[in-house]
């Protein structure tokens, strides 16, 4: 009859997870997201597990959710998953008041972020090396 309201924007071999309103600035979150881009999913989980940054555990939870979505919802092979995209976006800014001297005030801004992780199934590396040799 009509098109679905939200057509699938991902490929058949991709799955995603989205976390909204994380209490960290986008600049800091992007540093951690850069550690896992274009890495195999198992290696990315290991990197985040042993990272010293506070936000790394929230990123790890989102990555594990994307892996679970790939396995359960899209029947993808977990061993072949690669982090294709780790997108960081701005969210709300919470503004606070800070009293200063001589009756003045200043503003404290607390930034929030969105995180979207897309994992995709890649073919085995042995097949790609055979194609290059041919």
Swiss-Prot record:
Pfam families: Ribosomal_L22. The keyword rRNA-binding applies. GO terms for cellular component: cytosolic large ribosomal subunit. InterPro entries: Ribosomal_uL22, Ribosomal_uL22_bac/chlpt-type, Ribosomal_uL22_bac/org-type, Ribosomal_uL22_CS, Ribosomal_uL22_sf. One of its GO terms (biological process) is translation. One of its GO terms (molecular function) is structural constituent of ribosome. It comes from the Bacteria. Belongs to the universal ribosomal protein uL22 family. This protein binds specifically to 23S rRNA; its binding is stimulated by other ribosomal proteins, e.g. L4, L17, and L20. It is important during the early stages of 50S assembly. It makes multiple contacts with different domains of the 23S rRNA in the assembled 50S subunit and ribosome. This is Large ribosomal subunit protein uL22. It comes from Gluconacetobacter diazotrophicus (strain ATCC 49037 / DSM 5601 / CCUG 37298 / CIP 103539 / LMG 7603 / PAl5).
């Amino acid at each position: 009859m009509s098109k679905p309201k939200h057509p699938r924007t991902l490929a058949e071999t991709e799955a995603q997870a989205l976390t909204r309103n994380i209490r960290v600035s986008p600049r800091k979150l992007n540093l951690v997201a850069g550690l896992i881009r274009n890495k195999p999913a198992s290696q990315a989980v290991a990197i985040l597990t042993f990272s010293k940054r506070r936000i790394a555990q929230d990123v790890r939870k989102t990555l594990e959710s994307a892996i679970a979505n790939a396995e359960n919802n899209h029947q993808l092979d977990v061993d072949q998953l690669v982090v294709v995209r780790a997108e960081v976006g701005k969210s709300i800014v919470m503004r606070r008041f800070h009293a200063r001297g001589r009756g003045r005030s200043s503003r404290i801004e607390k930034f929030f972020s969105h995180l979207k992780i897309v994992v995709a199934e890649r073919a085995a590396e042995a097949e790609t090396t055979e194609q290059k040799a041919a």
